[in-house]
């Protein structure tokens, strides 16, 4: 029965209601100040102190009207999470004991968090504490409401006292500048004189798991590490394919409804929601936005999912592989290039063989991905992602590009004859049912096994881990494409005959880099062998991927476009090695703790009770074969568990004693992780034997199917 008192949501009014967006700025800022601020946002003009002061006052008044008592410089350090420090708007008490609410231009533009307390990879020592946050006016400020009240959040970049980037946003903004410069160079050669601004546009599909919070709190492995370290598969997993796009459960639907409302208030255009492949797995996707805004929005999405879940008695799991035996989670990064006058430069049009500018851009991107496949793979490297990539549930660890039949055919024409004369058409889809409409098919199918796939008017990078910031992969994509555009412009700007030169260059790039194009099954063993024959790198783990950051090629690339200095790259490599080691150390210690304090005692109690049962049956003169065999199996597995536990303890101690860096990370990867897997095997077998009432934590079945 419909609840007539249920509040109806006006999405149009709700959307952006907690965002200091362009509409609010037009209403609250003097025209001159509004224009000056937009010169900074649109053209990169330096913001003068007087303008900043007026903007700060208007922003404070708006936020206070929304109930805000504090503000924070909201930034993204290299921890993988966002960071914030809350400062109240109140001034020092006046002579009469009262206070005012104040917020200055200086407070808007600059903050000073402790840089030594965040990962810096050696860029900052403990005694070198000063760091700065700087307002990113291209990403709107917003008011976040939670149990602490309302807080004005100001998106900022974070750098050290000496100017090195200590965050995800700074290099992303640098890479966007580089792409704009080189793209404008390129499209000017094709006669475009109207576009003044170019930005990468990004839409991020976010996968996640939802479980009951009370059950989650009984799983110390989930609490400590974000994933289950032990767990036998339930009778049913995802093999029936009945969860994907299935009817959303009422409890989950209520959670999703509140998530949408919270995101809409914050200006995040949450568009799509559905069940994913694995039980208890779901996806949320917003409409695309400018790259740096999309990266901020994805952080807001992850925070909102976690906060709203708790309010519903649920727990959101963002780990890439919270459960063995079913699909893990990732995020798809949909990337395109758009101009301020509405042109999508990755739109091939209806006749791509005639769209020379598009073909130049396309072959430049092929060149970029082929030359820097190692960097692209590294941008998705994560300790949790190691469980997914190449495991027939996510793209393979081998970077390749899917173009589809239409564009592959155009490139083959270019390579074989030097020109393309036609484009394949999609035709009509006929269902054979008169009451169903016939409609035009796309010119090509989709390939879910490809890590970097062209999907009509954008590229979809599918390797990113579900917890990770999308800033890192977009820094790489944007910079390597900027380099390819720059190289092309260097050639074309010198050409005496532009038309001839551009056709020759398209053919050259298509020919040189055709090895990166693969439209087949990325999950197959045949592709692994074929990729090896083509000379494509197959980087299977995070530890193997990190060195790509500090090759001469990478240092030259990022240095040329001002995205990273060599010192910044080396610091990020060190941070990643250290982060990998710390994550594995926590997982190993958690396994040791859970096995020692919970699982082994529970199995011993079960064995003692089983032994008593054997004796009672024997006394009664009945057959003890079944309970005796159970007891033998249990004690044998318990012995294996104890041996594996001791082995893991020794390896974890040895790893922890090593100096931080590559060697330690490699030891964790090659020794400690394998010992963890070895311990899990007998424990998961014991779970299938021991009485459920005796087992010390909820099972996979409890977590995945009781939501």
Give the positions of each predicted feature.
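Catalytic pocket of metal/acid-base enzymes, prominently hydrolases
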Residues: 2-34, 48, 130-135, 140-154, ...
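Active-site core of metal-dependent hydrolases
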Residues: 14-129
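C-terminal amphipathic alpha-helical interaction region
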Residues: 506, 511-707
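Composition- and surface-driven signal marking solvent-exposed, interaction-prone regions
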Residues: 222-223, 298, 320-321, 347-351, ...
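Active-site proximal loops enriched in glycine and acidic residues that flank catalytic Cys/His/Asp
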Residues: 51, 75, 104, 286, ...
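Hydrophobic/aromatic-rich, well-ordered segments within soluble, folded domains that form packed cores
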Residues: 68, 72-74, 297-311, 337, ...
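Glycine-rich, acidic/polar active-site loops that bind/position phosphate-bearing ligands
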Residues: 129-318, 327-330, 337-574
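Short linear, low-complexity motifs centered on an aromatic residue
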Residues: 80-96, 113-116, 121, 219, ...
């Amino acid at each position: 029965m419909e609840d007539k008192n249920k509040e109806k949501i006006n999405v149009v009014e709700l959307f952006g209601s907690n965002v200091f967006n362009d509409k609010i700025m037009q209403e609250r800022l003097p025209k001159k100040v509004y224009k000056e601020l937009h010169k900074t946002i649109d053209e990169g003009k330096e913001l003068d102190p007087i303008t900043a002061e007026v903007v700060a006052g208007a922003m404070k008044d708006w936020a206070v009207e929304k109930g805000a008592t504090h503000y924070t410089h909201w930034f993204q350090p290299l921890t993988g999470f966002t960071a914030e420090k809350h400062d109240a708007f109140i001034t020092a008490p006046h002579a009469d004991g009262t206070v005012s609410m104040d917020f200055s231009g200086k407070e808007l533009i600059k903050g000073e968090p402790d840089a030594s307390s965040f990962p810096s990879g050696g860029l900052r020592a403990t005694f070198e504490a000063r760091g700065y946050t700087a307002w990113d006016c291209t990403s709107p400020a917003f008011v976040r409401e939670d149990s602490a009240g309302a807080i004005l959040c100001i998106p900022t970049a974070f750098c050290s006292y000496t100017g090195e980037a200590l965050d995800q946003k700074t290099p992303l903004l640098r890479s966007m500048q580089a792409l704009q410069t080189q793209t404008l160079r390129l499209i000017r050669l094709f006669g475009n004189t109207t576009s003044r601004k170019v930005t990468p546009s990004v839409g991020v599909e976010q996968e996640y798991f939802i479980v009951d919070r009370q059950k989650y709190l009984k799983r110390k492995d989930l609490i400590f590490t974000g994933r289950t370290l032990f767990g036998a598969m339930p009778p049913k997993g995802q093999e029936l394919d009945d969860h994907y796009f299935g009817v959303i459960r009422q409890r989950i639907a209520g959670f999703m409804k509140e998530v949408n409302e919270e995101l809409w208030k914050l200006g995040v255009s949450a568009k799509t929601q559905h069940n994913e492949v694995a039980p208890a797995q779901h996806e949320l996707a917003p409409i695309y936005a400018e790259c740096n805004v999309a990266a901020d929005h994805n952080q807001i999405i992850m925070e909102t999912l976690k906060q709203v879940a708790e309010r519903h008695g649920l727990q959101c799991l963002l780990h890439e592989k919270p459960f063995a035996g079913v699909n893990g989670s990732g995020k798809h990064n949909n990337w395109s290039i758009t101009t301020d006058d509405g042109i999508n430069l990755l739109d091939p049009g209806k006749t791509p063989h005639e769209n020379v500018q598009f073909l130049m851009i396309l072959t430049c991107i092929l060149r970029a991905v082929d030359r820097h496949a190692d960097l692209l793979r590294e941008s998705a490297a994560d300790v949790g992602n190691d469980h997914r990539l190449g495991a027939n549930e996510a793209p393979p660890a081998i970077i390749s590009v899917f173009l589809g039949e239409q564009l592959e055919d155009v490139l083959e024409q270019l390579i074989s004859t030097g020109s393309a004369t036609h484009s394949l058409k999609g035709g009509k889809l006929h269902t054979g049912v008169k009451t169903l409409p016939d409609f035009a098919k796309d010119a090509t199918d989709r390939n879910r096994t490809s890590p970097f796939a062209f999907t009509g008017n954008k590229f979809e990078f599918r390797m990113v881990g579900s917890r990770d910031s999308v800033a890192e992969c977009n820094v790489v994509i944007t910079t390597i494409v900027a380099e390819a555009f720059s190289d092309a412009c260097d050639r074309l700007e010198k050409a005496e005959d532009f038309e001839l030169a551009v056709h020759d260059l398209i053919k050259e790039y298509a020919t040189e880099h055709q090895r990166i194009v693969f439209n087949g099954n990325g999950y197959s063993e045949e592709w692994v062998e074929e990729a090896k024959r083509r000379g494509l790198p197959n980087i299977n783990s995070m530890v193997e991927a990190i060195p790509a950051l500090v090759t001469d090629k990478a240092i030259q690339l990022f240095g040329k476009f001002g995205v990273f200095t060599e010192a910044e790259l080396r610091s990020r490599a060190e941070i990643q090695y250290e982060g990998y080691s710390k994550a594995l150390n926590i997982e190993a210690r958690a396994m040791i703790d859970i096995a020692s304090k919970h699982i082994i005692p529970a199995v011993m109690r079960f064995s003692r009770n089983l032994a008593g049962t054997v004796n009672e049956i024997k006394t009664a003169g009945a057959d003890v074969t079944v309970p005796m065999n159970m007891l033998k199996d249990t004690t044998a597995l318990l012995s294996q568990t104890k041996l594996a536990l001791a082995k893991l303890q020794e390896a974890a101690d040895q790893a922890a004693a090593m100096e931080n860096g590559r060697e330690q990370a490699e030891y964790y990867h090659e020794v400690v992780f394998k010992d963890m897997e070895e311990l899990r095997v007998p424990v998961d077998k014991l779970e299938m034997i021991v009485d459920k009432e005796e087992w010390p934590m909820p099972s996979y079945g409890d977590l995945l199917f009781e939501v």
